[in-house]
Design a protein with these regions (language model features):
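Nucleotide-sugar donor-binding/catalytic module of glycosyltransferases
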Residues: 2-175
Length: 175
């Protein structure tokens, strides 16, 4: 890999709010983040005061899975919900771009690189992608979210920005 190229790429912060995570799914997601091809990442995880999953268990899972980029984990003092937790995470992000991450996703290894390249090639401020839908055993049940939500409309350009203030069309896969 070209070291000079890596240095030139901006930092992308992955933010993840967790609450009562299924630890196997969280591990799979963290391993998929570890496998990202984009070279300049950081991860910030915030536990929304999970009552039955020990915070230490979440910390141990991250320590086991994340080895190639910096990460930090913290915990809310009380449960405030995902919106406020993601708001806090967004404020803490140091990257030029922010990738929002759900605790039960599994990302393809080139996801962040692909979204970053889309931002560059389109001179965009935001990018998002479709997703395959998997079941509890990680078997693909739909190769596109549109197979499950046929009324879902993907928007681009000025149509996206105008509509984004009124509704979310990104399904969480955004940067």
């Amino acid at each position: 890999m070209n070291e000079c190229m890596e240095i030139d790429k901006p930092l992308i912060t992955i933010v993840m709010a967790v609450y009562e995570p299924n630890m196997q799914w969280l591990k799979e997601q963290l391993l998929s983040l570890e496998a990202q091809t984009y070279p300049n990442l950081e991860l910030i995880i915030r536990d929304d005061c999970s009552p039955t999953v020990p915070f230490e268990q979440i910390c141990e899972c991250a320590a086991t899975c994340i080895r190639s980029f910096p990460y930090e984990i913290s915990r809310n003092e009380r449960n405030v919900g995902s919106n406020q937790t993601f708001e806090w995470l967004t404020q803490q992000a140091r990257g030029e771009y922010i990738a929002y991450c759900d605790q039960d996703d599994v990302w393809l290894s080139e996801k962040i690189e692909t979204l970053y390249q889309a931002v560059l090639s389109q001179n965009a401020v935001m990018s998002y992608c479709d997703m395959a839908v998997i079941d509890a055993k990680s078997d693909v049940i739909a190769t596109s979210l549109r197979q499950i939500r046929p009324r879902l409309e993907y928007l681009t350009g000025s149509a996206l920005m105008k509509s984004y203030f009124f509704r979310n069309c990104t399904a969480g896969c955004s940067m």
